[in-house]
């Protein structure tokens, strides 16, 4: 569906990605409806897809997806573990509704159950594995897009994208290419630019391998030695030196700290003692009065009113 346009043709970079992910390798068995997409057969019995036809059907599927007004009405389904992560990533970038895992029977036909949905378009990973949603879609006239291998059944499939559905990398790459073309047709990303989302995010990852990688990362982090911090010393260095220097000068100069501490004698320099007047007599001590009201006036209550 490139229409002979140079901008829609398959690029060398996309061909390299497909060959690296073994997208061109099919199965040994062949469905008669898939023979038109086969380029040749190898000596070991493996069928090889024509990647140009794969690209043309991918563009057709992207145009059908981009034509749907509300992206949430597009359902992407994968019951196989290899395609569940790719389906979730595709839905996150395009706004489609993902169904990763087991499909609930009757979700498209039984209006009584809570999981009932009415999609406008259905995209499945493998027609052989996702047979139930394809069959229900045929009952309610929902168009179906499917990634098909050489031996995949094409019954009720409207747009078949020929590719290798047995490889986890091939499934992830095809979902990545489909998401990129949909975003290009919508105008979300430029066609002549590079999409900043790497294809590795669409690949399947074994949970055991992920757990092993996390464990190895924790062990590596624990093996890194923690720098030891030396205790801080709060002692004042050189205290004896400045104490001896002040003693040689004849005393300590008064400061505001001496006034704030009551009862602490103030030490003045020895050079200033000779200048003081030593002839002054101390003041006479005042003997306290024995009468408790001696200092008060005689009529101390006259300030109040008479009848209080």
From Swiss-Prot:
Compartment(s) where it occurs, according to its Swiss-Prot or TrEMBL record: Cytoplasm
Keyword Cytoplasm (UniProt): yes
Main location: cytoplasm
InterPro entries, per the entry: Ribosomal_uS2, Ribosomal_uS2_C, Ribosomal_uS2_CS, Ribosomal_uS2_euk, Ribosomal_uS2_euk/arc, Ribosomal_uS2_flav_dom_sf
Gene Ontology MF annotations: structural constituent of ribosome
Gene3D superfamilies on file: Glucose-6-phosphate isomerase like protein, domain 1 (3.40.50.10490)
Residue spans of biased composition, Polar residues class: 299-308
Region (Disordered): 283-308
SUPFAM superfamilies from the UniProt entry: Ribosomal protein S2
Biological process, per Gene Ontology: ribosomal small subunit assembly; translation
One Pfam family from the record: Ribosomal_S2
GO cellular component, one term: cytosolic small ribosomal subunit
Keyword field: Cytoplasm, Ribonucleoprotein, Ribosomal protein
Function field: Required for the assembly and/or stability of the 40S ribosomal subunit. Required for the processing of the 20S rRNA-precursor to mature 18S rRNA in a late step of the maturation of 40S ribosomal subunits.
NCBIfam families, per the entry: uS2_euk_arch
Subunit structure: Component of the small ribosomal subunit. Mature ribosomes consist of a small (40S) and a large (60S) subunit. The 40S subunit contains about 33 different proteins and 1 molecule of RNA (18S). The 60S subunit contains about 49 different proteins and 3 molecules of RNA (28S, 5.8S and 5S). Interacts with ribosomal protein S21.
Family named by the database record: Belongs to the universal ribosomal protein uS2 family.
The name this protein goes by in its record: Small ribosomal subunit protein uS2
Species annotation: Maconellicoccus hirsutus
Taxonomic lineage: Eukaryota, Metazoa, Ecdysozoa, Arthropoda, Hexapoda
